[in-house]
Amino acid sequence: MATNQFANRTRQTLAWITTCGERVRSWYEDYRFGSIDENAQLGRRGEQAAAQLLRRKGLNVIAESESDRAGEIDLIALRKRPRLIVFVEVKTLSTTRPGHPADRVDENKQARITRAALRYLKRKKLLGITCRFDVVAVWWPRDEPRPTRVEHYESAFNAVGVDSFYG
């Protein structure tokens, strides 16, 4: 009888420790990589999930939703060694329609991102630094607290209208 009570008490203690461990891990990940605002619109939540992924990969997210008259860049990240600026377009899909979120980054969108990136580099006096254009695809079904899938495509496209980088 005493061993049965001991076994039950041990199971309860382990369950409590596991629950506490999950809470601590969740808190630490939010602290370390950024949290997701569950009240934000879908696109914004997708950008937050993408920023978490980039931080996990060792990139430093230096700007979010950077925009000017040339267009908007969802995320701008920096890799320190070797020095590289990464311009990231995030596409979030909430439905079960066929198709890939990244397919929505067509040539017109690429051109707008390229122009906005050039203006950003000129404005910050960073024209000599290597840059890359990435796409992050996020699948986030309706009524789900977290995305079901997040994929990062490095060097997803080259600068469109490259001569404008030097004009």
Swiss-Prot record:
Instruction: Return the PANTHER family for the record.
Output: UPF0102 PROTEIN YRAN
Protein name, as recorded: UPF0102 protein RB9115
The similarity comment for this entry is: Belongs to the UPF0102 family.
- Pfam families in alphabetical order: UPF0102
InterPro entries in the record? Restrct_endonuc-II-like, tRNA_endonuc-like_dom_sf, UPF0102_YraN-like
Q: Which GO terms describe its molecular function?
A: nucleic acid binding
List the source organism: Rhodopirellula baltica (strain DSM 10527 / NCIMB 13988 / SH1)
Listed SUPFAM superfamilies: Restriction endonuclease-like (SSF52980)
